[in-house]
């Protein structure tokens, strides 16, 4: 099975923020794909093209490092990603290097890391904003029982669900 999101073609230059990016954004579905080159400095803003605050940001270093995919998520709704996960590892919630989301940009953590803004790296990022009936992001607390499991209200019938435990290395 392949899941594909249509953004908006080949992309166009975006000069919002400290680091220029090439952005292909579909504001109707809240999906943006962007490419940028790192500058090795912390707390850098990068344009995402959505026109609204994303809820999830997924970043991968394409060159200049052998880093995992990093997933940031704002589960509190305050514009700061309070959850950070490595998608290809077994680590739990990964440290306190958080991204902040604005309507036109996201700001990288204050620390410099090749996973999101190394000086010699090129990056691809996927930004997702919640759209009623299309996407919903959140978290839940499992009960630890083997019954039917929790009910998670999304407001629609999802076709694609991503689950990853963030409080344990299991």
Predicted regions mapped to residue ranges:
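Surface-exposed molecular-recognition determinants
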Residues: 1-170
């Amino acid at each position: 099975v392949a899941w594909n999101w249509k953004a908006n073609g080949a992309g166009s230059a975006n000069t919002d923020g400290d680091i220029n990016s090439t952005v292909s954004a579909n504001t109707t579905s809240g999906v943006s794909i962007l490419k940028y080159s790192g500058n090795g400095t912390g707390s850098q803003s990068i344009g995402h093209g959505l026109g609204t605050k994303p809820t999830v940001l997924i970043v991968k270093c394409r060159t200049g490092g052998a880093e995992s995919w990093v997933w940031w998520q704002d589960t509190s709704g305050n514009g700061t990603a309070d959850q950070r996960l490595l998608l290809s590892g077994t680590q739990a919630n990964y440290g306190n290097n958080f991204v902040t989301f604005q309507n036109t940009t996201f700001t990288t953590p204050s620390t410099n890391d090749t996973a999101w803004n190394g000086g010699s790296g090129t990056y691809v990022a996927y930004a997702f904003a919640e759209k009623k009936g299309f996407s919903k992001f959140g978290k839940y607390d499992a009960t630890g029982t083997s019954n039917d499991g929790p009910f998670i209200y999304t407001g629609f019938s999802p076709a694609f669900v991503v689950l990853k435990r963030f409080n344990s290395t299991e």
